[in-house]
Amino acid sequence: MDQPISVTLSSTTDPLWRSCHEYDNEMVITVNGRRIFPTLEYTVTGLDTFKLYSMCMHLDLVDDKKLRFTGGQWAESVSTEKKDPPRKVWHHNGSQTGKDWMLRNVSFDQIRITNRKSKEDGNASYVHLLTQHRYIPVLTIYEGDQLVHTARIPHSQFISVTAYHKGELNTLKTNNNPYSTGSRKDRRRERQSPVYSEGTSSEKSISPPPAKKIKDMAPALPDYSVISKPNLLQSLIFPMIAEQPSTSQSPPAPPVFPFNPDLQMQMLQPFMLPQFGFPCGFPSINPFMNPFLTPFTSMFPTPTVSPDGEGVKLEPEAFVEV
């Protein structure tokens, strides 16, 4: 006799679903779509290993009541809103054998619930829900085109809301949901908090959080004081010059002559002014032989010595009448 088909929530998600059900499980819906948490993950058994099956999920209204949270509890009233047929979301694995379906858990984590009907257009995984209504997930199994099994798990029902009303439920989901904003803040706070480690003694040491790494915008230059090769220093400071090929022989140095003060004075003698002795005030050199005073030699006749040795005789210049 063939084993009947059985559908249960997976062992990893069923305990959390039961815990949320104790607080009248609420599911937040948004305009942009929100994941269902806990995840709709099932374990299916009793399928024919060789037959082909396909599965889909839809969210069905539990009743025609609209809920309102007041006084710390939910109050019911008759819902007058229009109800559309529930939208079916097919599993992304499509059609496969019963062996493949039973090999692993069946998850519908691709479903997003929204409170805007237009979000369903062009988004196969989006499902529109009415706010403050009670829903229950329904898993349907098809063999070809024939419906063979429908599963409704009572403690998986929830109330669609735009914000949590019970703090205990909010804390429970935040601490277990990896996609929750509060859960991310808690994990970030844990990473930034000091880490306590026990050593050999009874005292506990606190290790500070790691400092932020600062990226250097420019590479650090080496210590030039330890560079012994000048060519290497030149290549670091002037890379364009270092690329030019260098010859092995340096150019010859200019000849160096010893310092000669007499030679230097002889070279500067034509440019020197006449030197006057002290205290007479007469020039110590012949002013008539100075090259700078050559224009004045025609104004002063040069004395001549007479042949008879009687002394110096000045010859008057001859004047020519014109």
From Swiss-Prot:
Q: What GO biological process term is on the record, naming one?
A: regulation of transcription by RNA polymerase II
Where is the sequence biased in composition, kind Polar residues?
171-182
Domain of life of the organism encoding this protein: Eukaryota
CDD domains per UniProt? T-box
Tell me which UniProt keywords the record has, alphabetically: DNA-binding, Nucleus, Transcription, Transcription regulation
List the GO terms this entry assigns under cellular component, sorted alphabetically: chromatin; nucleus
Residues within the DNA-binding region(s): 16-185
Q: Principal place where this protein is found?
A: nucleus
The protein's GO terms of the molecular function aspect are: DNA-binding transcription factor activity, RNA polymerase II-specific; RNA polymerase II cis-regulatory region sequence-specific DNA binding
Give yes or no: UniProt keyword DNA damage. Answer: no
For region Disordered, the annotated ranges are 171-214
List where in the cell it is found: Nucleus
Q: Which SUPFAM superfamilies match?
A: p53-like transcription factors (SSF49417)
Recorded protein name is Putative T-box protein 11
| UniProt source species | Caenorhabditis elegans
